[in-house]
Amino acid sequence: MKLVIVSGRSGSGKSVALRVLEDLGYYCVDNLPLPLIGSLLEQLKGSNDLVAISVDVRNMPEQDKVLVKQLASLPPDTELTSFFLNSSDKILLKRYSETRRLHPLSKSQVSLQEAIKLEGKLLEPMSKLVDHYIDTSNLNIYDLSDQVRQILLGSVDKELVINFESFGFKHGMPTEADFMFDVRFLPNPHWELALRPLTGLDEPVAEFLNRQPLVNKFIWQIENLLETWLPHLERNNRSYLTVAIGCTGGQHRSVYVAEQLAKRFSNGKHKVYARHRELNNAKA
């Protein structure tokens, strides 16, 4: 079982790191006391091989040797990776001032600045035991996400789920689309009597549309557009991308184009799906 422990000073980006881990398929638990890790791993054994927890200053033992003992008592088959996130006092003070959140160590007699300094002192033992120390003072959430992915995967690339959805404008436009393309200007198989009862999934319709230079040029240009901007969408922490292709009835042109685009992006780097709204509705 792989276990990732994320610790660090409040405001340094632990929640961002945990969200990245969740996107990578980890079962995530926020602010779990260290003595409970063993019980958690035992409960998840066999059902979850990827587990991540965040630990804040309120759940840390006061003595270094207790911390070392707790980490050493993990099950022998545990593959542990640990992160400590930190930022300068000045940056943490600025972040708390902007968000107006209450610091975990804030008390009526303790100022925010004093709480930040105290937390740094209490977490110092943990900062010396971790595998990866990341200073987030000059990082935005995207830079931090990239660093965490780089360490865990050896790459900053994020697995993006791409949905190509065909639809018919006469049945209404989909509301969840990130990109929407109108293909009603393309040659229409509907006017070929032999093709009218078929769909864009059928070979005769596919052959008809594949012979149309305008259709091939359109598919090529959409492919290039998406290839150009996909890396930027991935860096924006996007998990899903829905590309809607619409024709009049959602039976021929949009179905064919969606299928062709799905095939071109099914290269193993992304999870790609083709969905045909009107065809699915007709079956229901």
Curated annotation (Swiss-Prot):
InterPro entries per the UniProt record, alphabetical: P-loop_NTPase (IPR027417), RapZ-like (IPR005337), RapZ-like_N (IPR053930), RapZ_C (IPR053931)
Keyword Chaperone: no
Binding locations of ATP: G8, R9, S10, G11, S12, G13, K14, S15
Binding positions (GTP): D56, V57, R58, N59
Molecular function per GO: ATP binding; GTP binding
Pfam families the record matches: PapZ_C (PF22740), RapZ-like_N (PF03668)
Swiss-Prot/TrEMBL keywords: ATP-binding, GTP-binding, Nucleotide-binding
Function: Displays ATPase and GTPase activities.
UniProt record similarity statement: Belongs to the RapZ-like family.
Protein name: Nucleotide-binding protein Sbal_3671
Organism the protein comes from: Shewanella baltica (strain OS155 / ATCC BAA-1091)
